[in-house]
Amino acid sequence: MRRGNISPAFWFLWLLLFGLLGPSSENTTAFTKGSDTTTASITGSETTMASTMASTSALTTGSKITTDSTTGSETTSASTMASTAAFTTGSETNTASTTDSGTTIASTRTFTTGSDTTTGSTAGSETIVASTTVSGTTTTFTIASTTVPETTMASSTTSTAGSEKTMASSIISETTMASTTGSETATVSTTGSETTTTSTASSEATKVSTTGSETTTASTAGSETTTTSTSMAGSEATTTSTADSKVITASSMSSETTVAPAAGSNTTTASTTGSETTTILIKASETTTASTAGSETTTPSPTGSQTTIVSISGSEITTTSTAGSENTTVSSAGSGTTTASMAGSETTVSTAGSETTTVSITGTETTMVSAMGSETTTNSTTSSETTVTSTAGSETTTVSTVGSETTTAYTADSETTAASTTGSEMTTVFTAGSETITPSTAGSETTTVSTAGSETTTVSTTGSETTTASTAHSETTAASTMGSETTKVSTAGSETTVSTAGSETTAASTEDSETNTAFTEDSKTTTASTTGFETTAASTTGSEPTMASTMGSETTMASTIGPETTKVSTASSEVTTVFAAGSETIRASTVGSETTTVSTTGSETTTASIMGSETSTDSTTGSETTTASTEGSETTTASTEGSEATTVSTTGSETTTVSITDSETTTTCTEGSEMTAVSTTVFETTTASTEGSEITIASTSDSETTTASTEGSETTTVTTAGSETKTAYTTGSETTTASNTGLETTTVFTIGSDTTTASTEGSETTAVSATGSEMTTVSTEGSENTTVSTTGSETTTVSTTGLETTTTSTEGSEMTTVSTTGAETTTDSTEGSGTTAASTAGSETTTVSTADSENTTASTADSETTSASTTGSETTTASTTSSETTTASTEGSETTTVSTTDSETTMVSTTGSERTITSTEGSETTTVSATGSETTVSTEGSGTTTVSITGSETTKVSTTGSETTTTSTEGSEITTASITGSETTTASTEGSETTTASTEGSETTSASTTGSETTTASTTSSETTMASIMGSETTMASTIGSETTKVSTASSKMTTVFTENSETTIASTTASETTTVSTAGSETIPASTAGSETTTTTSTEGSETTTASTEGSETTTASTESSETTTATTIGSETTTASTEGSETTTTSTEGSETTTASTEGSEITTVSTTGSETTTASTEGSETTTASTEGSELTTVSTTGSETITVSAEGSETTTVTTMGSETTTASTAGSETTTVSTAGSETTTASIEGSETTTVSSTGSETTTVSTTGTETTITSTEGSETTTVTTAGSETTAVYTTGSETTTTSTEGSETTTVSTTGSETTTASTADLETTTVSTSGSGTTTASTAGSETTTVYITGSKTTTASTEGSEATTVSTTSSETTTASTTGSEMTTVFTTVSETTTVSTIGSEATTSSAAGSEATTTSTEGSETTTASTAGSETTTASTAGSETTTASTSGSETNTACTTGSETSTPSSAGSETNTAFIIGSESTIASTASLEPTATSLTGSETTTVSITASGATAASTTVSSTTFVLTKATDVSIQPITNTPMSGTRTTGTRLTASSSVTMAPGMDFTASAASHTVPGIVLNTSGLGTSTMGASSTTSAHGVRTTTGSTREPTSSTFQETGPVSMGTNTVSMSHTPTNVIKPSGYLQPWAIILISLAAVVAAVGLSVGLSFCLRNLFFPLRYCGIYYPHGHSHSLGLDLNLGLGSGTFHSLGNALVHGGELEMGHGGTHGFGYGVGHGLSHIHGDGYGVNHGGHYGHGGGH
């Protein structure tokens, strides 16, 4: 009853109240609806914005980042924008972004707070830039005021999507920042890699930077937006943005492809890539927008220079195109330079910077690769490229003979195809196994070698060396790995360098190149296609194509291969022929003509392929040996194989060998008419200059074939060389491929003199001719040593190379220098003798110088092609490369570069690593620079550069390996190195090198990846990937390691063994080749085999085997070990590692018991610790030579080191020096005991014995030393190694002591400085420590080790992982790496800084660790992404990575980017595939992504794979994200639409006004504005946000909010994630943030319009209260106040107690009225609640409470308007 009574009165009151309240709320309600509906519209985009806000909250949460991963980045962008907004806020805000930004700001802060902090900082600045951009937008915004225009603006927003770029722009502005970032780069550098990524974005950024201007432009774009230019920009942006980034991704990739398609268009594409650059270019078109961008250009002026860089990229463009980012990288490199600058010397590197430019090129290589997004393209290309690489891989595989390896390797199927060809090539080559026959011939070789007699021993060693030389075919390293592959392989390379055995792998590579040849064969078929395509790849690769080209030239080789194929076939037949090359040996004389052929080179390739036949060819190589001789010294190197690092050096020369491989091209040379092309080749050089046109060159590449033709002419020369061979072979000049080089010379090398040198070489050749007498060659080899001395002079040449650096300048002259190198060439010719290789190693140095100059050349790298021309010296290498140049020509000269890179590897290293090296080389320079003298060395450098080369070789490898990846790879590189360890094994593995190559291969796989390595991006990207792959590489390596080594070896071993059988005979050849390789591979086993090899081989290969064993131990123990020790020494702990390395050696030797030995080595390690002092000693070691003498005693100390024996072993050779020490020998004995340990190594002992013979071999090692001398040069790299080498050199003296090694000592002096470098290397040791750390990394690689082990197992596979385990002690692989590190040390030095830089990568290493798991890491790569995340810390790491970046930065910062991105990419890598798309996209993503990833996004990066999906969308998403941000902006537009809907709401002008006024902000801010309603209450504002959940009924204003809220809600619905979920967050968490929003309240200013009504409400409140009182009075009067009141009173109270009806009813009324249920609900509650209280008090309180609370609630815990406006108590309550 009462209730009923009350109800009437009550209802009356309610009705009255509603009547009072209803209207405005009513309107609101409608409004809300309209708004709501609109909201829905808003929801989509708005939500995004809102979402962004919410996300922002989330973003703050960080999950947002994840959530917004894309959006995040979007948000990040927005966030950045937000930050910008924060900065710019107004303008940014103006876009709905503000709303987001408000939140975003908080988020940004928060977000930034994330890893983004650094990044954020960058991003921040980036943001700031963006902010500026936004400001532009703001202006636009104003324009935007017009809803429609605003919509246009939305287009602008789209433009903003451009701003995606804007986001990127932010990043881009980052670039601007980056420009600022120039310093930023430092920061960026730190962030660098991140930034670099950004840089990548940078080119993007650059573009962005341009975009910075872009931003300006964007501002302009703003106007442009207004202009709709935005629209254009929008599309531009979209295109650019999405397309841009996407284009970048796609474009780069696409354009990359395009690039590939039209080198010219590539330029255009470059434009597209430009969009990569093109982003810039697109920016360029953006620039068109860039007209504004024009200012951009202006802005970019720095960027302009950036652009210039881009321009550099120009030619770069193709390169740049990819390089674009590369440029970016280069820019990054620029900043890279900055980074390089970071690198400091890096900057020097920057000079290397030009290196960077080179890097750009390399970068291009990388970037290309990176861009390889085209990477992908390349990758695709690479795919075939990979195939190529794979081929390289398979090549390795092939090398593995692995032919089956090939089969196994390929798998490398596409490779297989290549592989098949390669396979056959391999097989053929491997068949070169029958080459064994050749080895038989090698036997004759031996016979020849016999003439080589001891040479035979040496030669045998050489022979195997030759095999090694073949291996030395780092040849592969040269181009093959070279792509960056070499770099990478090189990485594995330098690891491989150790890999040099790696190069051995390279040999595999050579095989590779052989394969390449084969591959080319494959690609040959593919070749033109590939070549063309390769060229594309080349284009893409830029250098990559270089690599690819190399592969391309490979193609050229392929062309060569064509004939190569013929050769390959020839190789096959070659095998047969070479095989016949057995007679080939006789043919070797013929091969001499082979040399003439260079066919010898050709067969060289064949020989290289043959390399096994090399042995045969070796006989063939005879000239091959000449080359082989180079290989010979290579062989020496092979002996050096211990030096194998030396070999690496040799590999450097190996590269020369590679050059030879290039000669392989020369084989192409066979192209005869191809010769005519030669002129072209000369032109090619021009083409090389064309390098930019690289693509053109790629075309040229086709002409490359022409080049090959040139090579052909080379052939002609060769042909002349033909008979020349003998005569020409004196043309050894042919080896003087110099003739090629000569041709190359024609290129520049007109080495001609080189030929003359070749004449020298000729003598070399003569030796070569002697090569027939190979023995003579051997003698020459001796002279080879002399040549080595020449190499020493090589060092001198290296000095020249140093000059080389000068030469670098000279490099053109480099060619000339190369001519100087001429001696270089002579050396190069010697390369023919292998001294050339050594010289080449020297020249490699030269090449390195070239590589260094390569840096220059690299700079030249565009000229890289030119370099290739320059490579001329490169050509020397190139010479060999000459055809390489030809290839290089084809390669652009890139191949040349690549070949050169081979030395070119150095180049490539430089180039491939070139970039990296450039970075490394750069850092190499940096590292070298870090090496300081390294840089100096670099200059020396070049001399050292040889080191650099070696270093770069290593560096190259490291660099390449590090490139960062290599570093990572370095880790895995280590693994690879391990593999390299196995490298020795790898040498076998060489087959496994195939593994290594394979690793290289996988390296190749990485290579393949490397192929993608060719993708280089892969390298860079895969580089990371490579690293990852390295990881997996390792795994692969492991697999491969085992695969190649075991498998390969086993298989190839089988094959090898098979060959091994004949290998026995073949084994000699193969053994050394495979055996050496194989032995190197199984080294122990092969060593054992080698042992048997020795036994079997021993007979023939015997010494060969010994050499092989030596090679095995040699590689492992002596040289490597020595330098390794030095490295180890350098490594100090590295030593430990070195010890491990020792075991590595030991491992190699015993390797198993060696492990014991390794254990001993462990004590070795202790000794090594001593070795640590050894390091000192090592330093002394540098003087070590002298010291070595001293070292002798030192060595005695070393003797302690003796246990260092490894050192001793190496030391053994060291001992050899020591041997000079004699006691050292005793020490060696100690080493002997070490050896004994080694003996324990048993086989090691045997090896040791061999090692002894090693000593002998070491003597060979001596020649090894010579090689080492070369290694000396290598040693220079070895520097530590050098000193080690020096020691070895001493060993050189050891051997001959004779060797110019003495001069080697001089070289050593250079080495000394190298030692200084070594000292640097010492720091290298630090680095080595880093390397050690690398070891750690390797340890990290632990699994890496495992991987390393795997690599180890690679070694392990090869050797007893035990030692491997010891080796696994990471160092094993590390040791290997260390060995590599030895040279690696140089590399480590390079790597050191590289490592250091890379090492910074250590986290990278971590990545490497990841890499360790890397295989997993590939997944781990995801973790890599984690690493990337680590990269996030990477960002921190990146800071470190920054240095990494520095390295990476240079490394492509790309690499870093790749690394960062790389790991990022790894994420990207995961993204990798992402990368493929993402490469651009990924990097794009990385770019944008980096921002995103920059923060968490890295995690997101993990998502990035998702992002990958996103990536496509990512790109889109990112773009979208950006556009998402843009979209948000667009959304804003949507908001605008919403606003328009608001307009529907606008029907309710009030809303409309706020909406319009609010604009984007409008909706939300409108909500905020309603908040404004409670002026001064930011919380209220927050509340408003909060309100959203509650669908508050704010009168119209709130309604608007509600609307907004609803919209949000809808948005949420749409957004699902965002708004609502975020809301609370926004409200609660972000509340402060919202306060910022409150700050953003500016919108609130808009809001006030809405406020108006709210004000009305306030009026109503009073009215209501008054009305209530009035009503009460009225009711009382009407009903009888008392009675009714009582009735009401109790009922109310009861209602309060149990009266749900009123509550429900009131609620119902609320709903009916459409009022915020909360309000009445609260009211109802209040009444109910108040019901307990007195009506007056209760009502008041309750009502006040309820309403106040309700409203308050609506507003958020305002506690009310009531509190503020009504009863303190009620409100307060």
UniProtKB/Swiss-Prot annotation:
Induction (free text): Up-regulated by poly(I:C).
Domain of life: Eukaryota
Tissue: Expressed in lung by serous cells of the submucosal gland (at protein level). Detected in the placenta, lung and testis.
Cytoplasmic topological domain: 1682-1773
Transmembrane region(s): 1661-1681
Endpoints of the signal sequence: 1-26
PANTHER family in alphabetical order: MUCIN-22 (PTHR37000:SF3)
Name this polypeptide is given: Mucin-22
